[in-house]
Amino acid sequence: MAKLSKRNRAIREKIEAGKLYPVEEAVALLAELSAVKFKESVDVAVNLGVDPRKSDQNVRGASVLPHGTGKTVRVAVFAQGAKAEEAKEAGADVVGFDDLAEQVQGGEINFDVVIASPDAMRVVGKLGTILGPRGLMPNPKVGTVTPDVAQAVKNAKGGQVRYRTDKGGIIHCTVGQVGFDTNAIKENVEALIADLKKAKPSSAKGTFFKKVTLSTTMGPGLSIDPASLVM
């Protein structure tokens, strides 16, 4: 407990309450405060001006981050014929159809993203009770049900993140790791915000971007000055 208390004191001494941090300063400070033995993720929380109780104001989609997240992503693709070959060439880790469905039903789920060609949904649809709770069910809204499986694989491997408003109207995403170049984190956040802007519900009124917060896996959250971002 002594170490934890010492770290908490150090954090309190470094952070200014109520301050809006330029994104560059926030990234540098989060890296300075990181004191764990593993490589922490850098995460962003974006408070949106939506009413999550209304179905037409739920914001959901995907964004390809220009500098990726730093994580290795294993991709499974449900496709057959030429589409299966395209998926393999694009770098998919697992490609199959009925055989892949049998693996999933048998509990063999060693992947992070599932992509399906539209014709494969008759097979994938039966796996909803298995894939759904794990957040792996393909969905056209986030680009994981698509005829262009090759591009979807490249997106997933290249740092695509999926987002969805929670009950508080907040989007949570990983935008890199401690040790990333400051500008890379900034550009990843800006890419996400640009896509969120495109996804703004027409029924959402008032200020859409209410607050942006950067944090690390085990670190504090720092409120970001919107003037330091292209929004």
UniProtKB/Swiss-Prot annotation:
Instruction: Check the record and name the Gene3D superfamilies matching this protein.
Output: 3.30.190.20, 3.40.50.790
The highest taxon in the source lineage is: Bacteria
Keyword NAD (UniProt):
no
Q: Which PROSITE patterns match?
A: RIBOSOMAL_L1
One GO MF term on file is: rRNA binding
Q: Which GO terms describe its cellular component?
A: cytosolic large ribosomal subunit
Give the UniProt keywords, A-Z. Answer: Repressor, Ribonucleoprotein, Ribosomal protein, RNA-binding, rRNA-binding, Translation regulation, tRNA-binding
One BP term from GO: translation
Output the NCBIfam families linked to this UniProt entry: rplA_bact (TIGR01169)
Summary of subunit composition and partner proteins:
Part of the 50S ribosomal subunit.
Instruction: Write out the similarity annotation.
Output: Belongs to the universal ribosomal protein uL1 family.
Protein name as catalogued:
Large ribosomal subunit protein uL1
Q: Which species is the source of this protein?
A: Alcanivorax borkumensis (strain ATCC 700651 / DSM 11573 / NCIMB 13689 / SK2)
